[in-house]
């Protein structure tokens, strides 16, 4: 059965495609135009995840394993791909994968099929009812589409004939879907970007962040996006990503509080209140919005601005009030935007010791210096700046072993902020140097065993010698930074494209990169990571450091690659939020088991230590006032309460022996 007439393309087997697909981590970057390539034509037209590169990863795995049978929709999925190469450019930038080969393999597979091999998918009363709400095109129970939602809301190894996928385009349709599902006693769950679901798909939290049967409400079509410069606000639908909002806001010299580029903004508000390095200045939780429209579990539509509703901003705190499922679906929000200043600059302060970096961060945070503030680990810095995983590892090795650069305090602010930082710091890394490191990352990593670094490492203070002394100019000269140099690290056929990408000013503008957040997905290069953490009161430095060390000890206990990710101040420096990252092979069940243990153990120990608002306390409290989530500052729990905590987890996640 021919898929595309008169087109000859490279033959790729399902087996070869699966080798690529297994490395995919569902970061969602293929659904935003972050490199100026445009969007996948197939995904943009058809909507369902199966038509996007991300969804084809799951589709090809199930076809190869014989777990699904081909249907007419598989032909449409195969034919709709134009082999335009957009996905290769996007995915190679972030994860070094080539997903177009997966699409080619599906086309090759379909070409071997006979019409008689196509399975029919019966339409039942539930599907007919859903189609009456959204139209025939936007509701389906076809396994070839359903399978694409595996690992991003549907658990692996589950029966696909138990699901319906529906794509509403309005709040009213979401309400009708929920009422219809309730009428027929069918469970439902909304899906936005699916990143949180993807991260938890390999370990025990999947039981909380997935649907074992029922209706998946894919919110992608709720794409309303309006910028209101006169009030510095924006109206944002549930299908709008952070990148899309930020791009629209920047056209008016405005900025949204952001987390990750591919995250859907409304969902990001609901899930965690937007954890961001800009949060000390712009706020968190209910600070993010003026009003929201939401649909509850009964299908009732409300707004925060409705007169007479119960207090929508108050939250009960403590482990007994942890919730792992949202009680409402935010379908639209009016969110706050903030001015972009003409004199914004980036300045990094390098440190050897975490305590010194944290001390600098708190000084700046409590004085409200800077717009974006964070301590970043050398690992984070290396991952973000490096075009490949190997370069990032060499970059990190040089930072730690030659430069004694283990941490940087990252500051995005005005020139006035820069002056304050430079007065406090012995040495800094400015925008020109950061640009050189981005464009010279391959050459920098190649210095690993050089005489230059050996001599530098023998200095009493390598950081000061390099960044505040004459050796800086020698470093920059040796880097020979250029778009051509970075582009050569990519596959030959993509080098011309990436030379153009790295020639764009924004790709080396650290302030822009902080605002648009397109680099953090490099943490998901062909592997997964889990990032537990939380907020901690900043009144006791030793307590903070002991808390962070606890995460490191747990990582060592389970023999996982791990690193502190970032620390950022909140509430004028009264708190800091810390993310600690554990890296693992998402295809290895044993790794998934270890990750589940680390998550639960670190959360439990955080409750025991006290003065910590854990990530569990954050979940689905994003619409509340931050003061109601962060305060009162919690004391450590007792042994009796530890037992209660485990019982609570077992009621949601199953017995402890399954963790």
Language model features with spans:
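C-terminal cap/substrate-recognition region of VAO/PCMH-type FAD-linked oxidoreductases
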Residues: 334, 345-352, 361-504
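Ferredoxin-type iron-sulfur electron-transfer modules in oxidoreductases and energy-metabolism complexes
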Residues: 2-21, 36, 43-90, 94-121
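FAD-binding subdomain of flavoenzyme oxidoreductases
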Residues: 224-228, 236-367
């Amino acid at each position: 059965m021919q898929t595309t007439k008169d087109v000859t393309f490279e033959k790729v087997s399902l087996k070869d495609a699966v080798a690529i697909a297994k490395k995919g981590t569902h970061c969602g970057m293929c659904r935003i135009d972050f490199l100026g390539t445009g969007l996948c034509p197939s995904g943009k037209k058809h909507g369902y995840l199966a038509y996007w590169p991300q969804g084809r990863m799951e589709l090809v795995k199930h076809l190869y394993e014989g777990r699904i049978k081909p249907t007419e929709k598989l032909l449409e999925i195969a034919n709709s791909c134009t082999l335009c190469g957009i996905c290769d450019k996007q995915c190679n930038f972030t994860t070094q994968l080539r997903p177009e080969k997966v699409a080619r393999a599906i086309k090759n597979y379909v070409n071997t099929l006979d019409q008689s091999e196509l399975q029919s998918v019966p339409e039942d009363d539930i599907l007919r009812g859903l189609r009456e709400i959204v139209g025939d095109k936007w509701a389906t129970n076809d396994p070839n589409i359903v399978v694409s939602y595996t690992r991003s809301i549907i658990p692996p190894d589950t029966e696909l004939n138990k699901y319906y996928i529906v794509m509403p385009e309005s709040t009213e349709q979401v309400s009708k879907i929920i009422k219809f599902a309730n009428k027929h006693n069918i469970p439902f769950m909304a899906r936005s970007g699916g990143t949180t679901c993807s991260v938890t798909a390999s370990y025990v939290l999947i039981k909380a962040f997935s649907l074992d049967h029922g209706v998946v409400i894919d919110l992608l079509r709720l794409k309303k996006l309006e910028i209101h410069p006169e009030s510095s606000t924006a109206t944002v639908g549930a299908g709008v990503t952070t990148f899309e909002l930020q791009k629209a806001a920047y056209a008016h010299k405005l900025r949204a509080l952001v987390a990750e580029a591919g995250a859907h903004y409304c969902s990001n508000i609901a899930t965690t209140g937007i954890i961001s390095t800009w949060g000390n200045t712009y706020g968190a939780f209910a600070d993010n919005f003026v009003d929201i429209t939401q649909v509850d579990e009964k299908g009732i539509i409300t707004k925060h601005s409705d007169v007479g509703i119960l207090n929508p901003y108050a939250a009960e705190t403590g482990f007994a009030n942890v919730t792992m499922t949202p009680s409402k679906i935010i379908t639209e929000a009016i969110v706050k935007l903030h001015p972009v200043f003409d004199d914004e600059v980036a300045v990094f302060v390098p440190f050897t010791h975490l305590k010194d970096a944290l001390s600098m961060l708190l000084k700046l945070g409590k004085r409200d210096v800077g717009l974006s503030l964070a301590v970043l680990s050398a690992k984070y810095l290396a991952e973000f700046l490096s075009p490949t995983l190997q370069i990032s590892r060499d970059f990190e090795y040089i930072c730690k072993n030659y430069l004694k650069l283990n941490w940087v305090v990252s500051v995005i602010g005005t020139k006035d902020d820069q002056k304050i930082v430079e007065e406090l710091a012995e040495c800094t890394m400015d925008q020109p140097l950061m640009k050189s490191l981005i464009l010279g990352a391959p050459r920098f990593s190649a210095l690993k065993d050089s005489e230059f670094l050996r001599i530098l490492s023998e200095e009493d203070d390598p950081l000061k010698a390099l960044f505040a002394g004459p050796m800086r100019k020698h470093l920059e000269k040796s880097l020979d930074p250029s778009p051509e140099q970075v582009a050569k690290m990519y596959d030959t056929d993509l080098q011309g494209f990436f030379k153009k990408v790295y020639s764009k000013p924004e790709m080396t503008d650290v302030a822009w990169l902080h605002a648009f957040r397109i680099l953090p997905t490099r943490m998901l290069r062909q592997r997964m990571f889990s990032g537990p953490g939380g907020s901690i009161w900043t009144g006791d430095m030793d307590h903070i450091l002991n808390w962070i060390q606890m995460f490191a000890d747990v990582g060592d206990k389970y023999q996982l690659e791990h690193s502190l990710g970032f620390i950022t101040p909140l509430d004028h420096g009264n708190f800091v939020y810390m993310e600690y990252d554990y890296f693992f092979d998402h295809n290895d069940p044993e790794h998934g088991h270890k990750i589940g243990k680390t998550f639960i153990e670190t959360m439990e120990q955080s409750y025991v230590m006290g003065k910590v608002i854990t990530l569990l306390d954050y979940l689905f409290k994003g619409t509340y006032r931050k003061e109601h989530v962060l305060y009162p500052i919690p004391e450590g729990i007792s042994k009796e309460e530890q037992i209660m905590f485990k019982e609570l987890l077992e009621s949601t996640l199953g017995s402890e022996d399954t963790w």
